[in-house]
């Protein structure tokens, strides 16, 4: 049975089902009332991901439109395949890297298969959402190793968990806020949930023994936060040394530039 579209009852676009569907180019809608579609069970319907609509009882002209649209998309993808192995350059000849944005290791294979030269952002918070407890070190390690296998030597930048704020996690006691985008989230929760952060650092470090991984910290706004993160990273490295577990000793650490105040300390980072 080949799936041509998916309606998901969950309201989040971060559910594992949605992520998997997206990685296989399956049109998907979230927050669908599946029960309301019962009268059209075993009948042809069309899922329009661009319009956010499900079309039932399509007339002949509507059916022709969507069939033609599918052919156009297939032809467009085929035309674009010629660029998969080409270098990307600006109009004035400057070489630039085209990197992918992924939320799970299953997306890495599709990203590299479509010509990505690396993963510029692996949004790990998705691994913590839509579940009843946080992922353990072994689970995270296996996920990162799976992504590295698809990378085949190319670089992956892993952003540590940006949870809290507009990305709530039910099993953590993080209160809702009026302005969640710059609130108690990401690096600001790491000290309270230090064991969670250390677990993630250990899993990234362990996976770095198998490929090119880099670490990026979200929502940094002060030098104190950077120094605290570096301290925790050093502790995680020492733990692994004591346990004789290999990792990349020279793994790169960076920050995501997204908080305005970080611009006042950017010169101190070099």
Can you say where each PLM-predicted feature lies in the sequence?
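Extended, non-globular alpha-helical segments
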Residues: 1-4, 41-83
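Single conserved hydrophobic/aromatic residue that forms the stacking wall/gate
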Residues: 1-10, 270
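General beta-strand structural signal in soluble alpha/beta enzymes
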Residues: 8, 28-31, 47, 56, ...
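Short, ordered loop/turn segments at secondary-structure junctions
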Residues: 11-13, 32-35, 50-52, 59-61, ...
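Structured functional modules or segments
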Residues: 15-43, 47-51, 55-57
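Conserved alpha/beta-domain cores
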Residues: 77-269
